[in-house]
């Protein structure tokens, strides 16, 4: 059922299961990027898509309470919290001599804490009356952090401070991660919202958005194999989304080319 007129259909996939799968896949991808840098974009980039899909699913659930134009905003908040958490997770081990392999777990812990604090602040003093806002902010912060760290690690070839700083921060790639992952998290429900929204269609678009984010990073890295695989996966998934959309539509009207003269 939808809440507050937000336009959200019954769930086909339990949110906590989607969240757990997305978190596990993205964490595996982050470690693959560190331990096997030669396939960091091919496998690490692919598995980072899991965090985007899980984040999009949580956006769908919280936005159904009638956020309206807040759907894009909450996606940007997710990546804002995620960027802070990812940078802290990368830099703290280097500053305090902690083993670098704890970086992804530390990032996740920091993200959960940041998301919880921001969620509480949205209740008081901001005053949002969404019942699940604290848990949703916590989950969105976690998925944003894992998406940022996932794509940056895939591009740079690891997550140690020196690798990330030189390979993803100094060159501005982290900004690309912010926008690409942010769009993958906020866009699916924003595009599918309405009385005829379906979980299957929204999640199919979420996968397509995550895959196109991976494709963008593959192209930026000039990784031919990853680019080809990502393009094939994206074309198939987006094609599936279009077919589902046409099947769900009440009526399909094909608009001819606009006349060039009056």
UniProtKB/Swiss-Prot annotation:
It comes from the Archaea. It catalyses: 5-methyl-5,6,7,8-tetrahydromethanopterin + coenzyme M + 2 Na(+)(in) = 5,6,7,8-tetrahydromethanopterin + methyl-coenzyme M + 2 Na(+)(out). It is a multi-pass membrane protein. It is found in: Cell membrane. One of its GO terms (biological process) is one-carbon metabolic process. Belongs to the MtrC family. The complex is composed of 8 subunits; MtrA, MtrB, MtrC, MtrD, MtrE, MtrF, MtrG and MtrH. This is Tetrahydromethanopterin S-methyltransferase subunit C. The gene is mtrC.
